[in-house]
Structure formats: C-alpha cells, structure tokens
C-alpha cells in the first residue's frame, strides 16, 4: 500500500466495447441504479463487485437485455442497443444455476443456441466440438448433465455461451455453487479461457478474493453507484474511501489527528496516541481527523521484553492463528483497539511464534499507509 509501490496500469490503447451512460433503474419505485456511467473495453475481464443488493446483477441484466432501463443509454460497438431485445444482442449470459437442459446431452446443450439461430447443420458439429475442446470436455459430449461434476456443468454452460461467438460474455456469480477447491481451480481456468478466446468477460461476484484473482479491472459498487473503478492492485492498495477499504480484504483502520504539515507529502500526526509522519496527498489543517489504513501484511511487529525499549504502537498479543504460510496475530493496543498483523511463517526465528499476552511494538514502512479524510468530520 502507499506511495512507494508502483501500480500496474491497464494499457491506454484499449478500445471501448460497451458504454453505459446515465443508467437509472427502479423496482417498485425504489431506485436500484442511479446515474451509472461505465465503459467496458474490448478483450478485458471486468468484475462488478459489491455486497448483496448493490445493483451489480441488475447492471448485468441491463447489459444482457433481460431488464429495461428507466433512463440512460447502452452502446455495444458504437451501436445503441438500449431497446434491442436480448436475443438480438451479441451477448451471452452464464447464470449461477447454469440452466442446463437435463434431458439433453452435453453436445445438444451446447448446440441448442446454434439450432435456434438456424445455423446450417454442417457447421453445428465442428463448432460445438471446438467449444467443448476449449473447455476440455470434448470426451463428455454424449453425457447428460447429471453425470457431470459441478465444475464440468459450469464449463458446459460456458461452452454453450461461447459457441455463439458473442462479443461479450456475462457471468452472474457463476462460481458460487462450487466447493472451495473447485472454485479456486475454476478461477484460474476461467481467466485462461478468457485470454484464449479474446472475448470480453463481465463477471458479477460478492467474493473479493475471486475478483482480485481473475480481473483485469474491478468496479466496486454500493447502493446502485460505483465507489471505485480500477485494477485489482489499485483497488487493494489505494482504496478511495472507507467502504472500499473495508470491503476488499482485511484492513486496520487507525484514528489520527493532524499536528502539522512537514512538506508537500508528509504530515506530522498523532496516530492512536503515537506521534509519527504519514503521507497525505490532500490539504489538511492542524487538528483535522484522519484515518490511517494499513493491511495486516504491511505491519511490522517486534517483541518487547523488560530489557529493551521499542518505538511504535504498543500492545499485547490476544490471539494467534497459524495459517500455514503465515501467522496471524491479534494485538490489543493500550487504548483497547484490536490490530490484525500477518507475518510470513519463519520457524527459524525464535521470536516468531509469539506467546499470548506478549508485549509488542507495531510499526510500518513510512509511506506504505493509505490516508483518508474522516468522512464524519470533514
């Protein structure tokens, strides 16, 4: 986090595929999407991320043509498709339930869309088998859906969508029904498939780890509005507000009060009772309240024994959780605030496995912090 780390930027040459402008949608008089503007670029994997009820699935359904907008415009390849029926858009959707036909074979499920479009019979078999090869299911063509695992069913649903050669593939929480291990595997497979196909993917999820793993770009939503739009690294390391910071991964939020500005970048502040320098890229005044945000992995801890003195925030270990590669400790500061610290496991370090109630000093690399204005005391 913070200013010393460079962010991976999306190539500036990406061309827009979908443009949503001034989109508004209400259900039963309640506004669920409010003046939303969003551009989706050719060939990217974009994730709409947010809690239940934030409007992300509604946006997906509006793009697909499964819902109609109350106001605003939807453009696909510079063509206005706002009022074009779903079946006439070059868009396919993979739903959470997969919606496979149980009485049809895998081959027939994938071929269904082509038959509905009256595709010449000679084209159907090669196109279906090509789609099944892409998802590594060509040997399963004659099986029925009930003879497949959850992951295989999901791949059939994707093959059925891509066989139509859509410009855009929409995926609505399509991994949420899978168990943890299979979900992790499918995250990698989906991203690899998207690269291979070159089709633009728009993926909807409430799972932030899923979004960080797969996406070229993440759009974080709340209450029908976009809170932040950026690369996974930007969203994780440079959250624009407290909602995004708290929604994406674990984060520690320290209260701070400005003492004085030292230079263009640094401010002297009181952070949870300790005076230190923090990097602040906006105007502040003495006495102003701030939030200093640090991820658990960005904190450094040192045991304090009777014979040594350490600088930093002072606290005591209250919980330890061994996570294989990391040790997560909960440290209670002297003012009662709980702080999460994550350290890479080092069995050769005699001080690594901290005892409960061990006195600790917490520090961080200057400039790794993200500083936000206190939204309640602006």
Swiss-Prot record:
Q: What is this protein called?
A: Spermidine/putrescine import ATP-binding protein PotA
Q: What does this protein do?
A: Part of the ABC transporter complex PotABCD involved in spermidine/putrescine import. Responsible for energy coupling to the transport system.
Task: Name a GO molecular-function annotation.
Answer: ABC-type putrescine transporter activity
Spell out the GO cellular component terms annotated for this protein, sorted alphabetically and separated by semicolons. Answer: ATP-binding cassette (ABC) transporter complex
Keywords for this protein:
ATP-binding, Cell inner membrane, Cell membrane, Membrane, Nucleotide-binding, Translocase, Transport
**UniProt cross-references to PROSITE patterns, sorted A to Z:** ABC_TRANSPORTER_1 (PS00211), ABC_TRANSPORTER_2 (PS50893), POTA (PS51305)
The family database entries (Gene3D superfamilies) matched by this protein are listed as:
2.40.50.100, P-loop containing nucleotide triphosphate hydrolases (3.40.50.300)
> Per the record, what are the reactions this protein catalyses?
ATP + H2O + polyamine-[polyamine-binding protein]Side 1 = ADP + phosphate + polyamineSide 2 + [polyamine-binding protein]Side 1
Q: Which organism is it from?
A: Shigella dysenteriae serotype 1 (strain Sd197)
Quaternary organization:
The complex is composed of two ATP-binding proteins (PotA), two transmembrane proteins (PotB and PotC) and a solute-binding protein (PotD).
For membrane topology, the record states: Peripheral membrane protein
Which SMART domains does the annotation name? Answer: AAA
Where found?
Cell inner membrane
